[in-house]
């Protein structure tokens, strides 16, 4: 929460006074790809930090019907889609979920970010081995 009792990080569907500015790419509707270049789902919404005035998460609608959050720092966006190098498309199904679809707790943020961070080191067997 921040001053006034409002939630700090919310989806754009709640923070209707925020939007993606031109000429930046609005990723809503674009496919989301894992490191294996397979499609995991598509971008449903963006979550904005209203205090910092920046996007924190991408809400991904998976092909299974579930919805997960993807930290912006683990994504690369271009006109063809959102690319994630830390996990495979199949591993999106195991991303920790939020209890609410309109807000995120600090603990949930930690778990979600840790999942993608751990994927950077452990998503593939070859990532777990020494380099030399």
Regions found by a protein language model. Name each.
Residues 1-132:
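Peripheral interaction segments used for macromolecular assembly
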């Amino acid at each position: 929460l921040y001053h006034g009792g409002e939630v700090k990080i919310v989806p754009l569907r709640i923070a209707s006074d925020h939007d993606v500015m031109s000429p930046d790419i609005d990723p809503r509707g674009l496919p989301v790809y894992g490191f294996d270049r397979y499609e995991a789902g598509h971008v449903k919404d963006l979550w904005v930090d209203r205090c910092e005035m920046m996007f924190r998460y991408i809400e991904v609608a998976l092909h299974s019907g579930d919805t997960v959050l993807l930290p912006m720092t683990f994504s690369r966006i271009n006109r063809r889609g959102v690319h994630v190098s830390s996990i495979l498309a199949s591993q999106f199904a195991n991303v920790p979920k939020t209890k609410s679809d309109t807000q995120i707790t600090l603990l949930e943020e930690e778990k979600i970010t840790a999942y993608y961070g751990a994927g950077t080191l452990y998503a593939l067997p070859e990532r777990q081995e020494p380099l030399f």
